[in-house]
């Protein structure tokens, strides 16, 4: 045996196949209302889809897009593409046709696998925009062969992990696109393995985890699937996020672990039936994807318990740049609750100024990362790669300050910073202050064009049910804490703040709406 084979590293698909080949009778995966699938049943279904996809021509480096709501087949198809050494490109089920088509065209997708019942019309639209795109469905569809029927007629065969190397592309996707057009990016085997190494080693998992996921399995909803498998746990999948369904599932299934975004936490706390459910089984609630109001996080800890664990990452360095552990959530210190935690020991992290020089504690700087967690670059965008990979660092675009204990507090995206009257204003700080008011459920702050100041600080606020507050009171609250130059010039009350498919406040949509509706400034 050659030394290259003797010391060949393991990658994500090795872990997946090894784990699926053990403990076949252990319960593993259940879609709410459906049967509980054992490890052996998931293994066999994965094997059937491996064979079915191979018959469609999927093999090494074949680019396969996947579009579906939450159902077990999402995991079966994703795992099968990995085992065939193909490249998976998940399409967010709530994404727009334009964004889906952008990824398909930019990444050169060859096959689209979709859920026939829900997405046949979208698949047909995408096929018209991408000539040569082959279609396959699970469930009947008038425009494609049923991959599920083909798979069901095949006999399970042993699963064997492919030989892959660290630089091999495993996944294609897009950045969130909150500041402009989505950016197509590639994620290698190395990056995915680094992410799971950190998650398995650093995240605070119950033993064993009983996981609830309500996020799309094509995206963050699947992030807990492999850890649940490796740690002897189970995963209950909901079709989507609905507060009562989530709380009911936690109570009935004694869920001890879940992953949410901040807006989901707010929706649970504000629901009139919150107090009806027993959530005491929860041991760890992972949360991330966008900033959280410290005041609302304090409320969540006081009402649900000290179970919250924050992760910070981005598509370009996924999930695990920093971690704020459960024990580090100090309800008596709102500055700590505003922190995204400390850098993982598995990555090099620093804060740099506009001239790429390290900044001291207490001074804003851009979070920059290097190490195996960093993605391999944007596709077909050499200019953006040049500005993102600079000076030996990946520049995240997030601005943070570091305290003497090493905790980072993100003050904003560099592109969200407001320049008003020559002053740099970070919306995150104003949002946190507004959210401390007992009448405020959620706040978003943006800059809109102003003839005198360049940009005017503008707040968009969602009130809690049955609560009232005047714009003047909120403006005065910010002025008292941050000075009049940082106080909003206007406050607009809305029923809800638009979100991206990933659950982040969609400030691009907010800016567009406010600029459309704006009256001329005096």
Task: Give the ranges of each region predicted by the language model.
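Conserved AMP-binding A3 loop
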Residues: 36-40, 170-194
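Structural core segment of the AMP-binding/adenylate-forming
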Residues: 55-56, 83-150, 465-467
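Gly/Ser/Thr-rich phosphate-binding loop
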Residues: 230, 255-259, 270-335, 348, ...
């Amino acid at each position: 045996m050659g030394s290259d084979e003797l010391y060949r590293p393991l990658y994500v698909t090795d872990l997946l196949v090894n784990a699926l080949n053990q403990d076949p009778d252990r319960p593993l995966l259940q879609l709410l209302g459906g049967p509980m699938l054992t490890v052996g049943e998931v293994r066999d279904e994965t094997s059937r889809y491996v064979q079915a996809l191979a018959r469609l021509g999927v093999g090494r480096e074949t680019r396969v897009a996947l579009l579906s709501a939450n159902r077990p087949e999402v995991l079966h198809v994703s795992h099968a593409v990995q085992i065939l050494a193909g490249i998976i490109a998940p399409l967010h089920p709530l994404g727009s046709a334009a964004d889906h088509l952008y990824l398909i065209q930019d990444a050169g997708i060859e096959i689209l696998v979709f859920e026939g019942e829900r997405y046949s019309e979208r698949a047909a639209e995408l096929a018209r925009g991408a000539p040569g795109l082959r279609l396959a469905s699970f469930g009947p569809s008038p425009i494609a062969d049923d991959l599920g029927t083909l798979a069901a007629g095949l006999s399970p065969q042993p699963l064997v992990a492919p030989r892959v190397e660290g630089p091999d592309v495993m996944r294609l996707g897009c950045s969130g696109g909150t500041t402009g057009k989505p950016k197509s990016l590639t994620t290698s085997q190395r990056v995915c393995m680094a992410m799971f190494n950190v998650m398995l080693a650093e995240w605070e998992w119950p033993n064993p985890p009983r996981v609830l996921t309500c996020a799309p399995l094509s995206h963050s909803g699947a992030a807990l699937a492999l850890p649940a498998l490796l740690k002897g746990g189970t995963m209950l999948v909901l079709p989507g996020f609905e507060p009562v369904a989530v709380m009911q599932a936690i109570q009935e299934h004694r869920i001890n672990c879940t992953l949410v975004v901040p807006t989901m936490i707010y929706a649970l706390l504000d629901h009139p039936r919150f107090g009806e459910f027993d959530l005491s089984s929860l041991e760890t609630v992972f949360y991330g994807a966008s900033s959280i109001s410290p005041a609302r996080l304090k409320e969540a800890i006081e009402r649900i318990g000290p179970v919250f664990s924050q992760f910070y990452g981005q598509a370009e360095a996924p999930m695990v740049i920093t971690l704020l552990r459960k024990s580090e959530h100090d309800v008596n210190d709102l500055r700590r609750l505003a922190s995204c935690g400390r850098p993982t020991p598995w990555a090099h992290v620093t804060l740099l100024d506009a001239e790429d020089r390290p900044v001291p504690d207490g001074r804003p700087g851009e979070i920059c990362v290097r190490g195996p967690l960093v993605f391999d670059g944007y596709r077909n965008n050499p200019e953006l790669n040049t500005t993102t990979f600079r000076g030996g660092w990946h520049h995240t675009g997030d601005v943070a300050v570091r305290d003497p204990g090493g905790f980072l507090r993100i003050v904003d995206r560099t592109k969200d910073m407001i320049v008003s009257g020559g002053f740099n204003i970070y919306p995150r700080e104003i949002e946190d202050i507004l959210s401390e008011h007992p009448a405020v459920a959620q706040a978003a702050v943006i800059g809109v064009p102003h003839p005198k100041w360049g940009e005017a600080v503008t707040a968009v606020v969602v009130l809690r049910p049955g609560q009232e507050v005047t714009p003047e009171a909120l403006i005065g609250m910010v002025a008292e804490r941050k000075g009049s130059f940082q106080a909003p010039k206007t406050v607009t009350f809305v029923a809800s703040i638009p979100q991206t498919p990933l659950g982040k406040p969609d400030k691009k949509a907010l800016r567009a709406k406010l600029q459309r509706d704006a009256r001329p400034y005096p």
